[in-house]
Amino acid sequence: MILNTGARTDTVQYYSEWLLNRFKEGFVLTRNPLFPDKVTRYELTPDKIDLVLFCSKNYAPILPRLREITDKYPVYFYYTITPYGKDIEPGVPSVLESIETLKRLSAIVGRNRVAWRYDPVLLTSKYTIELHAKAFAYMAEKLAPYIDRCIFSFVELYKKLTINMPELIPMTESDKRKIADFLGKTAKHYGIRIQTCGTNGDYSEFGIHSSGCAVLSELGKANHCEFKDIKHKGMREGCHCIENRDIGAYDTCPNGCKYCYANKNPQAAMLNYQKHNPQSPLLLGEVKDTDTIIQGVQRSYLKSKYPQLSLFDMELSLIHISEPTRPEPIS
């Protein structure tokens, strides 16, 4: 089974102790968001978990103890760093701080297991196409030696977002092509593989790939293991990722990002965060007498057992971190 720790909330930034406790105890419970009295149990043992996916905007809280997970499981990390300020992402560290944290993460796990998400790309009177071009070039120069690839998507104008962000400027196809053009050129200049995620549209002419952000071939290569060749069903429309199971909960992320789809409102998320018990098998709340607990299906995608990395392998994956070669900035 592919375990996802960060699709519904920023587990790493706010619930690291809980996550580490779950791995230590060897199981986790997750409540069905549509049927709250239905609870699924997943075993978190190496024989049941093929790989652990992380997605966060701040890995600093878990870095001191990260090896408790990475020494036992194949892993892959998505680090979201965007140019938005506190007006849009009030709970997210600054770009400079995030870049330094990503470097530390990369030093621990190897650049081959770290992807930078520049996501979502949105436009307002403040965050213009020109600002994105400058910000992306700056970040790409700093991050290139420490990442496996870059993933981006254009913001989706769902109904709640138009209410939360009335300042949002709808993107035309011309806008998207302009953005894709400079993203592709900048990524190529710094030697970064760049791809879309869950975005309809073909931008291959700009050197942008359209593969899913979590595909077995890439995850296997990053972890020196081999997965079966199976169809990737995706997690939503336009998604080409492998099916995975998330153990988080909606309405629990205090980051307060205005574009977030996982929170109904920031106030509810903050209240839930304050009620969190790191000793509970559930991220939010406790098991109730009325709950029905079922054993989750944990299908393995591995073709062969995961081999432990040798020190030689780790040195090879980290070689570009110690002596990064950087091209000259785009003038």
Residue ranges and their predicted role:
Residues 1-88, 100-106, 111, 266-316:
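Conserved Radical SAM active-site core
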Residues 84-92, 120-130, 164-171:
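Surface-exposed cleft-lining segments at the edges of enzyme active sites
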Residues 97-163, 181-198:
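Conserved C-terminal portion of the radical SAM core fold
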Residues 245-264:
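Local cysteine-cluster metal-coordination motifs and their immediate loop/turn environment
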Residues 319-331:
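Single conserved hydrophobic/aromatic residue that forms the stacking wall/gate
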